A protein has these predicted regions:
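Nucleotide-activated chemistry modules centered on ATP-dependent adenylation/adenylyltransferase
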Residues: 1-173
Length: 173
């Protein structure tokens, strides 16, 4: 079962998937290095890890990212052609949304259309609608509330219910 509540609660360690980001980074490093070698160019790779993840997920911390990148460089020829970008390492979900809002505007994209196509929920229903009680959903809704926007994804019981649930939950933090 996926625990419900805020990431500040002790039970959120149950959401940890051991070495998850190491697995992701190993795959993206291998692909990036292959592209760099075949095309003879440098490749930047980005990871969306953010400060909200640090307390629960050890592989989202700067120390882990540095150690992972150093191991990658030590273990591969031409690894210096691949650079890591972690633009949100010290930001939260709100800063990601704020950045997304800026770039959607700058690029002429419809913010709601872009974010309607994303899913943060750990417990979507069979129709793909987001829950609003798991920590990932709570954190997302909290960021949208801070941004002053309605989240365009569809929630199981609707936005009003999801918003009210998170507002009540946040009174405890």
């Amino acid at each position: 079962d996926v625990p419900e509540g805020h990431y500040e609660e002790d039970n959120m360690k149950d959401t940890v998937v051991p070495n998850r980001n190491k697995i992701f980074s190993s795959i993206i490093q291998a692909v990036a290095l292959s592209i760099a070698q075949v095309r003879g160019c440098d490749v930047d790779i980005a990871m969306g890890i953010h400060a909200g993840d640090h307390a629960i997920y050890p592989d989202c911390r700067q120390e882990f990212r540095d150690a992972d990148y150093n191991a990658f460089k030590e273990g591969n020829w031409d690894a210096d052609k691949v650079k890591y970008i972690t633009p949100y390492l010290y930001g939260d979900k709100f800063s990601i949304l704020e950045d997304g809002e800026f770039w959607c505007d700058k690029l002429g994209l419809d913010f709601d259309e872009v974010y309607r196509r994303t899913n943060t929920s750990y417990k979507p229903d069979a129709e793909g609608r987001s829950d609003y009680k798991s920590a990932s959903s709570v954190e997302r809704i909290e960021a949208f509330l801070k941004l002053g926007r309605r989240d365009p994804v569809e929630y199981i019981d609707g936005w009003k219910t999801a918003k009210k649930h998170v507002e009540q939950l946040l009174l405890n933090y």
